[in-house]
Amino acid sequence: MAATDLERVSNAEPEPRSLSLGGHVGFDSLPDQLVSKSVTQGFSFNILCVGETGIGKSTLMNTLFNTTFETEEASHHEECVRLRPQTYDLQESNVHLKLTIVDAVGFGDQINKDDSYRPIVDYIDAQFENYLQEELKIRRSLFDYHDTRIHVCLYFITPTGHSLKSLDLVTMKKLDSKVNIIPIIAKADTISKSELHKFKIKIMGELVSNGVQIYQFPTDDEAVAEINAVMNAHLPFAVVGSTEEVKVGNKLVRARQYPWGVVQVENENHCDFVKLREMLIRVNMEDLREQTHSRHYELYRRCKLEEMGFQDSDGDSQPFSLQETYEAKRKEFLSELQRKEEEMRQMFVNKVKETELELKEKERELHEKFEHLKRIHQEEKRKVEEKRRELEEETNAFNCRKAAMEALQSQALHATSQQPLRKDKDKKN
């Protein structure tokens, strides 16, 4: 036997011994204690409704819980898909239920439907993250924490009678690892029974061929194994919703009145509404809550903790302590921080160098422009000086001509003034 096998044998816990009691102790009341505590604490159940606008999501919710939930009228012109949660306090007998209905408003209404699933996935992850953060608190209070994790997704399929839309396949494929999906055919009274049967077979075949994992009612519990196995064969449920009461015979029943007859909501020959209500609420509600916590949330939690550096040890290695994980993550963070600082410093140096080169280039351009303007100025100054010199020469020449002209004029004037005097002298002589 190998050394590791010996270690495993030596470290194995001894089998507990079975003992008989000599009298009544009292721990047989544990189930009653658990029931009493659960009833006092109350229950929460969160339903996500995904389907096109006007397909009957709100009507079905009102029909399922036999009440009228206040909801806003949805529009066909939503720019993007948005999640609208509404929480209600319900009570049946002495059981208190905090019910949250989350409607995917605007789903399938956009021209570009490539990312229609993204807001839904983000919302589900956000609820997981909120619960994880509450778990990681030093002083956590999960007892009175309002659990908003989605327990079931009712996926409403348009009753085309042909096949699933690509949007439906893509969305359910993105959601199947995050939430329990129950596909239902809405407004099932719009297609015939034969077409409905073929449509169900077509839908299940497409889901299997595309690897979409929908919620299967559990068959490991003997108390519900038989009914759940039968109901699994009826998926997807074809439902009709209505809050109106119609008189059929001598009693009022919830139904839809048509010119050709009445479709009774709770008549299993007309639709699968009763099957859906039984499977969703009466038989498997607790299993949906448990699957959400033990499967979908645990998968999210494990991925998040692995991202943080936590991991489970295998059988041959020592378990990782929180201190070791902290130190490893701290070193990793510090090295990453130093790397980022070096990158930023180098980026800053490169930016400074680029700025210096740009400034030098600007300086050179300004200097060249200055020299060019200086040469232009000197040339203009030379031209002005030359013009001034020419003007002075012309002015001097003009003054000289003017002086000569004035001298000639004075001589001529003097000569004309002497002529009469000479004539007078000649007469006297």
From Swiss-Prot:
Domain Septin-type G: 41-307
Region of interest (G4 motif), residue spans: 186-189
GO CC aspect terms: axon; myelin sheath; presynapse; septin complex; synaptic vesicle membrane
Biased composition (Basic and acidic residues): 1-16
Listed Polar residues bias regions: 409-420
Pfam families per UniProt: Septin
An annotated Gene Ontology molecular function: GTP binding
Localisation per UniProt entry: Cytoplasm; Cytoplasm, Cytoskeleton; Synapse; Cell projection, Axon
Residues that hold GTP according to the record: 51-58, 106, 187-195, 241, 256
Region feature G3 motif, mapped onto this chain: 103-106
Region (G1 motif): 51-58
Sequence positions bearing Phosphoserine: 10
Coiled coil (residue ranges): 320-412
Gene Ontology terms: biological process: regulation of intracellular protein transport; regulation of protein stability; regulation of SNARE complex assembly
N-acetylalanine PTM sites in chain numbering: 2
Domain of life: Eukaryota
Region feature Disordered, mapped onto this chain: 1-23, 409-429
Keywords: Acetylation, Cell projection, Coiled coil, Cytoplasm, Cytoplasmic vesicle, Cytoskeleton, GTP-binding, Membrane, Nucleotide-binding, Phosphoprotein, Synapse
UniProt xrefs under PANTHER family: SEPTIN
Family statement: Belongs to the TRAFAC class TrmE-Era-EngA-EngB-Septin-like GTPase superfamily. Septin GTPase family.
Protein function: Filament-forming cytoskeletal GTPase. May play a role in platelet secretion. Seems to participate in the process of SNARE complex formation in synaptic vesicles.
Subunit description: Septins polymerize into heterooligomeric protein complexes that form filaments, and can associate with cellular membranes, actin filaments and microtubules. GTPase activity is required for filament formation. Interacts with SEPTIN5. Interacts with CDK14, SEPTIN4 and SEPTIN7. Interacts with VAMP2; the interaction inhibits interaction of VAMP2 with SYP. Interacts with STX1A.
Name of this protein: Septin-8
Gene: Septin8
